[in-house]
């Protein structure tokens, strides 16, 4: 069969480290859909509408990251809980397959770098 891509304007989850967010003209976003299907798929994360400023319950499609210009980003809707973001992070690692190439030491090294890249600094 043929592949599928999300089209049109839709909510998305900016899923990029803070350094990238502040220095790049682009963002990496994960699309959301209100079509709740394949809930057992490990790359899908359910988001309750009331927990995220959304109109409808939605699913984060972690297997379909999109790079987009910040000029194409719409309004801010809300922030996901740390618990939900952990689920998204895990689903994203599974979607990319990158985790299968890392041993425990490499995972800790990557985690340490991620903490540095996501540190919030005052300007």
Language-model regions, residue ranges each:
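C-terminal terminal-subdomain/extension
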Residues: 49-114, 123
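Cationic, low-complexity basic patches in intrinsically disordered or flexible, solvent-exposed regions
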Residues: 117
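Compact nucleic-acid interaction/catalytic patches
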Residues: 2-9, 13-50
């Amino acid at each position: 069969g043929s592949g599928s891509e999300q089209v049109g304007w839709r909510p998305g989850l900016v899923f990029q480290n803070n350094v990238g967010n502040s220095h790049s003209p682009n963002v990496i976003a994960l699309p959301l859909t209100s079509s709740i299907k394949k809930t057992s798929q490990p790359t899908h994360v359910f988001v309750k509408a009331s927990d995220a400023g959304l109109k409808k319950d939605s699913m984060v499609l972690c297997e379909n990251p999109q790079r987009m210009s910040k000029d194409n980003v719409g309004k801010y809707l809300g922030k996901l809980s740390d618990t939900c973001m952990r689920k998204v992070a895990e689903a994203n690692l599974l979607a990319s397959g990158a985790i299968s190439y890392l041993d425990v030491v490499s995972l800790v090294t990557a985690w340490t770098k991620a903490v540095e890249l996501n540190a919030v600094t005052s300007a």
